[in-house]
Every structure is written in structure tokens, then in C-alpha cells.
């Protein structure tokens, strides 16, 4: 069972539809016990970083997500949800994040239209489980004005938009997509299928303990 975190700032409906499409069992929840009982977690998000962190704090989900991230349970952040995984953001004000990944969220300062919205090429950097069946140079769908300034060793996908935008990051059990896999057609569905596979592998490993 995959828990989709519902904190009032997520693209919940489209993520639900995507998981339904790939046959994944899921629950939409903000209940701590349900999140801990799940086999994997998706943290979606649309909106401002400081507001999102305030809401997560109010719902006592900051601690929950940090515990999930520091365990071996698979965690996938999408768009703002990915940004929240980092140490802090410069959006509106300096604001601390979940600190599960090293790096800072900074405003895109490019001679192009902001937000970066639409389809862009994703170049793979290294291999991870979520790349199974995903061709290098596939196009994915973005909507964002900020990006992760983070170490190269956690970047597994890059798009160009005046700067190199980390489109996909990963460290251990933690994954983050700056783009929207649930809106990225067959390629996005394949990535979500791969995440489902990672979740199932983790669940099997727990049953054997």
C-alpha cells in the first residue's frame, strides 16, 4: 500500500489517477499511523515552500516524514514535494525543509519565461531502479519556478532551462522528481511503475524479517 500524503497542497487527484492506472494499491491520508503502516510514501505538492512546511508542521507530519525518510521505506517527492525533501528554500524567505537530502532550493534566474512550464528533455545521469524502461532523452512535464541546488552525486536526471535543472534526485530510499511523472504520459507511468516495484521489493524484504 502506497500512502499519498494529503496536506491540502498536493496534486492529489492526478497522482491518484496515475496509481490507479498502473494498478497500485494506495491510500490518500494525513493520518500518522496509516502513513507508518504503508509500504511506500508519495509526497506531492503545489504552492509555496514556506506554507507547505507550516502545514506539515501543523499536522505533525514533519517528524513523520523525517522518520520515513531515515528508514528504508521508499519515499517519492513530486514537484514541491521533492523540494521539501531538501535542507532549506529561499522562496519568499529562508525556510528550513525536511533535511532528508543535501541542498538548497533556489529561484530560477534565467532569460526565459518563469515558471518553467511544459515538456522538456530529461537526460539520465547514472542508473537507478526508477529508470528501468525509461529511455535517455525522454520528455517530461514541468511546472516550477525554483530548482534544487544540490550535490551532483544525488542527481540522476537533468533538464536544461538556462541552467542545469536537477529533474530527478535520489539517495538510498529517497527519490524526488521536479517534474510531474503523473502528467508525463507513458514515460511518467513507467517511472511510477518502477517506484511501485521498489515499494513491493521493500515490502517483501520486511515480510522475510
UniProtKB/Swiss-Prot annotation:
Q: Which GO terms describe its molecular function?
A: glutaminase activity; imidazoleglycerol-phosphate synthase activity; lyase activity
The UniProt entry, under PROSITE patterns, shows: GATASE_TYPE_1 (PS51273)
* Known EC number: 4.3.2.10, 3.5.1.2
Q: Print the keywords alphabetically.
A: Amino-acid biosynthesis, Cytoplasm, Glutamine amidotransferase, Histidine biosynthesis, Hydrolase, Lyase
* CDD domains associated with the record: GATase1_IGP_Synthase
Reaction it catalyzes: 5-[(5-phospho-1-deoxy-D-ribulos-1-ylimino)methylamino]-1-(5-phospho-beta-D-ribosyl)imidazole-4-carboxamide + L-glutamine = D-erythro-1-(imidazol-4-yl)glycerol 3-phosphate + 5-amino-1-(5-phospho-beta-D-ribosyl)imidazole-4-carboxamide + L-glutamate + H(+); L-glutamine + H2O = L-glutamate + NH4(+)
Instruction: Copy the pathway line from the protein's UniProt record.
Output: Amino-acid biosynthesis; L-histidine biosynthesis; L-histidine from 5-phospho-alpha-D-ribose 1-diphosphate: step 5/9
- Annotated coiled-coil positions are none
GO CC annotation: cytoplasm
According to the entry, every stretch annotated as the Glutamine amidotransferase type-1 domain falls at 1-205
The record's subcellular location field reads: Cytoplasm
Keyword Glycosyltransferase applies: no
Q: Which Gene3D superfamilies match?
A: 3.40.50.880
Cysteine disulfide partners in this protein: none
| One of the GO biological process terms | L-histidine biosynthetic process
Pfam families under this entry? GATase (PF00117)
Q: How does it assemble?
A: Heterodimer of HisH and HisF.
Q: Which HAMAP family match?
A: HisH
Q: What does this protein do?
A: IGPS catalyzes the conversion of PRFAR and glutamine to IGP, AICAR and glutamate. The HisH subunit catalyzes the hydrolysis of glutamine to glutamate and ammonia as part of the synthesis of IGP and AICAR. The resulting ammonia molecule is channeled to the active site of HisF.
Name assigned to this protein: Imidazole glycerol phosphate synthase subunit HisH
Q: What is the lineage of its organism?
A: Bacteria, Bacillati, Bacillota, Bacilli, Bacillales
